Amino acid sequence: MIDSATVAAILASVLDGKPLEPEAATVLLKARDRSLRQQIQAAANQLRSRQVGDRVSYVINRNLNFTNICEQHCNFCAFRRDADQDGAFWLDASILLEKGAAAVAAGATEFCLQGGLNPAAKRNGRSLDFYVELTASLKQAFPQIHLHAFSPQEIQFIAREDGLSFREVLMALRSAGVGSLPGTAAEVLDDSVRRILCPEKLDSATWKTIIQTAHQVGLPTTSTLLSGHLETPSQQAQHLEQLRQLQQAAIAGETPARITEFILLPFVGELAPAPLRKRVKRDQPDLSDALLVMAVARLYLGDWIANHQPSWVKLGLAGATQALDWGCNDLGGTLMEEHITSMAGAQGGTAQTVEQLEAAIAAAGRQPYQRDTLYRPVAVEAVHAG
């Protein structure tokens, strides 16, 4: 039984500037009593205000999922298809450029570019050539756009296909126009969970190596946690510890890039493969549990990773807005389209307008502002004029 005095002592220590450790974080993550969760929420909200202030950011961006053809079979994924399967798609450059032009006309500053692991995606017999050509075509057409592109899993796939090092792949993509990497494919950085959740995916050590290498070559990354499936509170805490260690290493090593944000990705199982859905026994995320994890993430990471974002796609805009009182200071992006989570049965929608995001932030009593991918404020007049 977790008592109020224990929780209060942990929270007081964090608010006094002492780093939260995995054991204490596990205690907080096990809190089920509403009053205990309210204590944790209050501390996370206080720390958020102290660390990043009371303004809330958003980014005007567009998702570009260029293919769902994938060689892997992750047990939580309803997005992937075999090449000859109904619903499979592989968008050519002309369609991506058309989508990009529409996004730029709507004021976008970022494209988020990710896809399945398609062994046929090659140019001149090489995977890297395909990804470089894809990146360069978008960057040449829209030089002002930041390309937030290719997860560590995609980097590992390219390196394996072509017999290259991670550094070689990352350097080539950076030269072609990639500006940062999404820190997806992390799921939970515990290989006992990964063996059930995504047995074909890269392991935890490889994910961390690719993130570190990206920082070393000057590519910022995000960080994520897929929560609410098979993982335990202890595994959640250890995941946060590994993210913190990555950022601490980047700071200590004075690498030219760092982790820019933490995003919680609650599991959506409604249309996910049946075996995992049956084990989890829940189709939609539990908002209360997701809010608790976000609060503990703020307490754990806030001094090192200051920006925290909920997923309105997974939680709905109302749920994501609640997260602004649980340690989050960003409401994410407009997206304009979304396939991966919506195909799993998420009910949060696939796009938000600037007006919707700003209204949600204002309703939470905060001041909205537009940012770029690296959390720099955007001069709105300049964006719309350009």
UniProtKB/Swiss-Prot annotation:
TM regions (residue ranges): none
Cofactor(s) of this protein: [4Fe-4S] cluster
GO molecular function: 4 iron, 4 sulfur cluster binding; 5-amino-6-(D-ribitylamino)uracil--L-tyrosine 4-hydroxyphenyl transferase activity; 7,8-didemethyl-8-hydroxy-5-deazariboflavin synthase activity; iron ion binding
Catalytic activity: 5-amino-6-(D-ribitylamino)uracil + L-tyrosine + S-adenosyl-L-methionine = 5-amino-5-(4-hydroxybenzyl)-6-(D-ribitylimino)-5,6-dihydrouracil + 2-iminoacetate + 5'-deoxyadenosine + L-methionine + H(+)
Pathway(s) where this gene product acts: Cofactor biosynthesis; coenzyme F0 biosynthesis
Cross-referenced InterPro entries: Aldolase_TIM (IPR013785), CofH/MnqC-like_C (IPR045567), CofH_family (IPR019940), F420 (IPR034405), FO_synthase_su2 (IPR020050), rSAM (IPR007197)
Binding-site list for [4Fe-4S] cluster: C70, C74, C77
Keywords, alphabetical: 4Fe-4S, Iron, Iron-sulfur, Metal-binding, S-adenosyl-L-methionine, Transferase
E.C. numbers: 2.5.1.147
Domain Radical SAM core, chain residue ranges per copy: 56-303
General function of this protein: Catalyzes the radical-mediated synthesis of 5-amino-5-(4-hydroxybenzyl)-6-(D-ribitylimino)-5,6-dihydrouracil from 5-amino-6-(D-ribitylamino)uracil and L-tyrosine.
PANTHER family xrefs: FO SYNTHASE (COFH) (PTHR43076), LIPOYL SYNTHASE 2 (PTHR43076:SF1)
Assembly and oligomerization: Consists of two subunits, CofG and CofH.
Name of the protein this chain belongs to: 5-amino-6-(D-ribitylamino)uracil--L-tyrosine 4-hydroxyphenyl transferase
Protein's organism: Synechococcus elongatus (strain ATCC 33912 / PCC 7942 / FACHB-805)
Gene of this entry: cofH
